[in-house]
A protein has these predicted regions:
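Conserved ATP-binding N-box helix of the HATPase_c
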Residues: 252-289
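Short, well-ordered alpha-helical packing segments
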Residues: 139-150, 240, 259-266
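Short, conserved secondary-structure transition motifs
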Residues: 177-180, 212, 263
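Internal, well-ordered alpha/beta segment that forms a basic, Gly-enriched binding/recognition surface
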Residues: 184-232
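Glycine-rich/acidic phosphate-handling loop/turn and adjacent ATP-lid/helix
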Residues: 291-340
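Intrinsically disordered, low-complexity linker/loop segments enriched in Gly/Pro
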Residues: 222-253
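Signal for well-folded cores of large energy- and translation-related assemblies
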Residues: 244, 266, 270-274, 302, ...
């Protein structure tokens, strides 16, 4: 009698492995230990996590970790046992959304930072087995965090190989992505795509991949106007493409209005941020369910650093009436402690 092997459904996952192996002379960590950088004792010539971050962390990551009011302040995360992962495993909540489930979502992002930058895990896992919904803004925040971490790791490994091999995990993995809609978002515009691991096409998805623009260097500033025009056109063309999927179109006037709106948002996100860096991403899904056919378009434009209100309140030439209105608008977003 022959027994047939059961065909089990494959669970989607992704893996980012860094180009080094742990040396046999190094102890394999069991679980994790909290290591405040001020009390870490490292062998001669080896830098601690804190020292490596101080030297090589990109601007956005450094801002997130060091700003006192940031929900991702590294000193606060070190002290908070609720922000630790489970032996390197971070379970993504059922609803991963800073809008609909802010407390649990912020804690999850803090756990990711702890797993990567505080604990001594050999590997870090993001477990999506419980998750059935992610909003695109929260996905973007997570992806930017991981991209900044990846940039940091690449630079630090080139310059301080021994220290990085001793202090950091050799890879990160997303696993148990069982929900079909989550799988489509994650593999089209999410972490695997942003980190350059893999990017997949789906017949019902139109993506506008993560765009990152900065004006930190002189060359960046010279190209600012041209890049803004290019990105504005790209975003409007993307919206037009999504509308065409639904057999809809924009009139020339409405297209021009949309160009004006996108252009203003992009330039505000760039010029009025203290970090002079903006990100944008778009995601469209063609949906047929319960006898209804419709499209869902989601766009995110964000930056890190000071808010527009914080920027203008320090400008003596800005009218006080405008500053007061901006303060009220800012407080409507910050009263839930989602943003600084």
């Amino acid at each position: 009698m022959k027994f047939q092997k059961k065909n089990r459904p494959r669970r989607a996952k992704f893996l980012k492995k860094y180009p080094f192996e742990f040396r046999k002379s190094l102890p394999i960590p069991k679980g994790f230990k909290i290591r405040p950088s001020s009390s870490v004792h490292c062998p001669s010539g080896i830098l601690s996590k804190g020292e490596l971050l101080n030297r090589y962390a990109p601007n956005n990551l450094s801002y997130m970790l060091n700003t006192p009011m940031s929900p991702f302040n590294l000193k606060d995360i070190r002290k908070d046992s609720a922000s630790r992962s489970t032996n390197g495993v971070v379970t993504i909540p059922e609803v991963f959304s800073i809008y609909d489930n802010p407390d649990e979502s912020i804690i999850t992002l803090r756990k990711i930072i702890s797993a990567l930058l505080v604990e001594t895990n050999r590997h870090v896992y993001f477990d999506y087995s419980r998750c059935h919904e992610i909003d695109i803004a929260t996905q973007a925040i997570m992806d930017i965090l991981l991209k900044e971490y990846d940039t940091f790791m690449t630079k630090a490994h080139k310059l301080q190989r021994r220290s990085v091999e001793r202090e950091f995990a050799e890879g990160i993995t997303g696993r148990n992505i069982n929900n079909d809609n989550l799988r489509k978002m994650i593999f089209s515009i999410g972490s695997p795509a942003v980190l350059g691991i893999t990017q997949r096409d789906f017949p019902d998805i139109i993506r506008n991949s993560m765009c990152s623009r900065s004006m930190l260097t002189e060359n960046d500033r010279k190209n600012l106007s041209a890049m803004k025009e290019l990105d504005t056109t790209d975003m409007v063309d993307y919206v037009v493409k999504c509308l065409a999927k639904m057999n809809k179109r924009l009139t020339p006037k409405k297209r021009n209005d949309l160009c004006t709106v996108f252009g203003e948002i992009l330039i505000n996100a760039e010029e009025h941020s203290s970090l002079k860096h903006r990100f944008s991403v778009g995601y469209f899904q063609d949906i047929n369910e319960n006898g209804k056919h419709y499209g869902m378009l989601k766009l995110v434009i964000l930056n890190y650093g000071a808010t527009i209100y914080e920027t203008f309140k320090k400008n003596d030439s800005c009218p006080q009436e405008v500053v007061s209105k901006m303060k009220a608008l800012s407080e409507s977003y910050t009263h839930r402690n989602l943003f600084t």
